[in-house]
Regions:
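Substrate-binding clefts and catalytic carboxylate motifs of secreted carbohydrate-active enzymes
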Residues: 1-118, 122-126
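Compositionally biased, intrinsically disordered or flexible polar/acidic segments
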Residues: 104-280
Length: 280
């Protein structure tokens, strides 16, 4: 990775575990394996849990210079969490974490839920017409609320303009990272992305509507440090029926990497049969 080799740790320390897209690597259960990481730090410590306990410590590796990376060979991987901590001048400065399917839950796994903001709980006094799991399937959250599958009944993207293309092509992704601020990771781990041709349309009667929008930044900031700054790297607007309701939204600035971001807007749909939410 470029940053691991050519960005000094003094400027922007980082560590990246290989790989965030290989969650099923241990789907058949516990076994020994080689774990790799990229970092510009002086050394990296590897753990099989959320804490620094000796029982789940997998070893410390030193930085051997440009063109090399960190490797822990023949390690016993027992739990479903791998966590790498990068050290610079003797201090922990960067951290990365991946979740693995098929393994026993890490002893301190519940720490990943400690900042649950319960932001999905429906507001009292409101009748919710739609809840949609953007990019995902039907999902019932921790409050018993059903979020509908994202399908072409509601969403539109660029691929629909081309015959025989999957309508979700290059506008739908998933992440296996834990999501900070909620227990309902699944709802945020499936998502849509795109530019001006991504939109949602919902049939409604005339009236004033309260719209709750939920976001996360799944890419920028992975494996970074407290000094990592991704502000301004992804900025977009959200409109309702051609009127901008969120201008220059920067999810990183709102909630950082893999954090939940909630926005509430109010709009009046007069003489419309749909609420249309495009992004740009």
């Amino acid at each position: 990775m470029y940053r691991a080799n050519y960005v000094p740790a003094a400027k922007d320390p980082m560590v990246y575990l290989v790989s965030h897209t290989w969650a099923n690597r241990f789907e058949k259960g516990r076994r020994r394996a080689t774990i790799e990481a990229y970092s510009n730090c002086d050394s990296v410590l590897l753990y099989n849990d959320l804490t620094n306990e000796k029982a789940t410590f997998l070893g410390r590796k030193k930085n051997n210079g440009t063109g090399t990376h960190f490797m822990w060979e023949n390690r016993d991987i027992r739990y479903n969490v791998l966590r790498a901590v990068g050290y610079y001048k003797g201090k922990p400065v960067a951290e990365d974490l991946i979740l693995l399917n098929g393994l026993e839950q890490a002893p301190n796994f519940e720490l990943l839920y400690q900042d649950d903001k319960k932001i999905l709980k429906g507001e009292a006094g409101y009748n919710y017409l739609y809840r949609l799991n953007c990019g995902g399937d039907d999902y019932t959250d921790s409050f018993g609320q059903l979020w509908l599958q994202d399908n072409t009944n509601y969403s539109r993207s660029w691929a629909e303009n081309f015959k025989d293309l999957n309508p979700y092509l290059a506008s739908q992704r998933t992440t296996n990272d834990p999501i900070h601020g909620t227990r309902d990771w699944t709802l945020f781990q499936h998502f849509r992305f795109g530019r001006h041709q991504l939109e949602y349309r919902f049939p409604v009667a005339d009236g004033t509507y309260r719209i709750e929008l939920y976001f996360t930044e799944p890419w920028h900031g992975t494996g970074g440090s407290a000094s990592t700054d991704c502000e301004g790297l992804r900025i977009f607007d959200v409109a309702v029926n051609d009127s901008v309701v969120l201008d220059d939204l920067d999810i990183w600035a709102e909630s950082g990497h893999d954090g939940v971001c909630k926005k509430i807007v109010y709009t009046t749909a007069v003489s419309y049969t749909h609420l249309t939410l495009p992004t740009n």
